[in-house]
Amino acid sequence: MEIEVVYQHSDFIIINKSEGISVHKDQEEQGLTELVAKQLNVPKVWLVHRLDKVTSGLLILALNAESAAEFSRLFSEHKIHKTYLALSNQKPKKKQGLIIGDMKKAREGAWKLCQTKDNPAITRFESVSCEPNLRLFILKPQTGKTHQLRVAMKSLGSPILGDGLYGKNTEKIDRTYLHATQLEFDYLNNFISVTCLPSQGQFWIKPTVFEQIQVYLTKPFLSK
């Protein structure tokens, strides 16, 4: 399987991870990193952050230990700005704003958003209607909690389209419609901005959806 390399630097690469590929610490993680290393003809690559198995889009892989340490610092200091796109067929309680609250483990591997704010997950978002019963969400996480965006969307009453863990009636949906579309950060005094549009999934390629994604890219939303 060929992994799409979206951006290449002497210290790191950014790939477009396909939906359905796990990067967590199981047997598949080693497979992903080994596959990329083999493709690049390098001894090893370092995973410096994660995407859920159901999420597609931009993923940074360091090419040396020093770069991995630098990215660890950047992520811990919240200096890497991430933007995600999501789709939902449910109307949200509010169309834009801030979703904030502590996250607590629920049943069957799921998480839930709490009213408390001791160590909260924070997400800025905006949304726009693509067509009846289909809405595009632009999500900007300010923290990096497990399942943060999926839980945030559920808390709005708009679970992500196709999300079998947090939504309902997902059997006929071909994927979970969450995509990491943009990364922006300073790396050793160089500003890096990478954008990757979603293409994997029947709803991403709908003209009404693609049009609204293009509008977002050319006309800044409040949270951008």
Curated annotation (Swiss-Prot):
Q: Which GO terms describe its biological process?
A: enzyme-directed rRNA pseudouridine synthesis
* EC class name: isomerase
Please, which domain of life does this record's source organism belong to?
Bacteria
Entry EC no(s)? 5.4.99.-
Family per record: Belongs to the pseudouridine synthase RluA family.
Under InterPro entries, the record lists: PsdUridine_synth_cat_dom_sf, PsdUridine_synth_RluA-like, PsdUridine_synth_RluA-like_CS, PsdUridine_synth_RsuA/RluA, RluA_PseudoU_synthase
Recorded hits in PROSITE patterns, A to Z, give: PSI_RLU
Catalytic reaction equation(s): a uridine in RNA = a pseudouridine in RNA
Could you list this entry's UniProt keywords, alphabetically sorted.
Answer: Isomerase
- GO MF annotation: an example: pseudouridine synthase activity
SUPFAM superfamilies per the record? Pseudouridine synthase
- Mind telling me what this protein is named? Uncharacterized RNA pseudouridine synthase HI_0042
Gene3D superfamilies registered for this protein in UniProt: Pseudouridine synthase
Q: Name one Pfam family in it.
A: PseudoU_synth_2
PANTHER family, sorted? MITOCHONDRIAL RNA PSEUDOURIDINE SYNTHASE, RNA PSEUDOURIDYLATE SYNTHASE DOMAIN-CONTAINING PROTEIN 1
Could you name the active-site residues?
D52
